[in-house]
């Protein structure tokens, strides 16, 4: 009996000791090397890099082709509009939005208005990519699984753009109202003024994107007529771009591509012939002479028509040795001094803004001289590629800012199309609105002679979020490549 009594006391003592120890269990068992919270300074650069890489990869694989900047001579499904799932933008936007949401929550809790503003700008740009690519997408319910929203509704594109414009305005107003440095920023290195310029420049882009659906003149004028309150890009120094490194693992995405994969992509005849007609010095930056003439005294440039079948594309003009490849600045020379200055990740540039303002001024939506904006855009594009604008360039009939309003708008759109070469998906997004230049689907296209205007929704959405997916399709139109989204209707 005494033995049992002693054992019972021992058990009780052990229980008491265990209970006492558990009071500090969380503190004792917290790994100091595994943080439970990640700072905005660590989250921000990863968001920026991942989004830039996604956009540049999608542009290389599909965006440059559909806008007829490049063409393919092998594995030509993309060029013939045989598009399957294209989920890069979708996945990257919604994956990274979780971290953007964390930055928003942390910045609000800590009174960090600069970080909040940057997060709102990133959110706005990211959702603009998603809705520009697919149309209606989850927006107000996105990244709300922790709050119990496992089946987010698809917001209308109109509501998304209203939200984007509101967030960009809020961001512009917030920037500079707190003192914290924007540590971790790999786009503007924490420059608050440049972030403010980006917010307002993106507002101009967004307003012009929806300008066929409502009168945007008052909103545009409120920005352009008040530079002290709403500054915009003033030069190429303000370009919202990501500069890659010369060393791994942060090199330009194509620098480490297999040479065979890189060389499947060739100059599009549409763009190359245009550059040759204009004797445009950007041509040898964008493209290389044919391999057969590359090292000769008389280099020859030849582009491939878009939309050829595999046999015709590979054999065009006598074969790959007689077809121009993409410039080395986007491949092996991407880590050179010149390559680092040109082969970047793109959000928006000063040249694009000037072309948007030229269009707006020509249409009477803003004050200012359309010709000046137009020529600023052309000059900025040449300057970005470290080139001087040819002295007679603005005297060329195809370039000179003269003619009817329709002819002037054609020239604005045409030069913007050239300037947006491999600058993300913007050339395609913008072309769908303007129709400039007048592109023709390739002879062997598989899309009923129509150039696609959107991506299909990811198949997983039909399986996991079927009701929301169906509501979006019923509202927007069939889930195919040709259904026009709200601002295109």
PLM features: what roles do these ranges have?
Residues 1-30:
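Bacterial Sec-dependent N-terminal signal peptides
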Residues 150-151, 388-397:
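Substrate-binding clefts and substrate-entry loops adjacent to catalytic sites
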Residues 38-40, 68-122, 126-384, 402-409:
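Structured, solvent-exposed acidic/aromatic patches
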Residues 21, 253-277, 283, 287, ...:
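Long, intrinsically disordered, low-complexity segments
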Residues 21-77, 82-84, 91-94, 102, ...:
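Membrane-proximal, proline-rich intrinsically disordered regions
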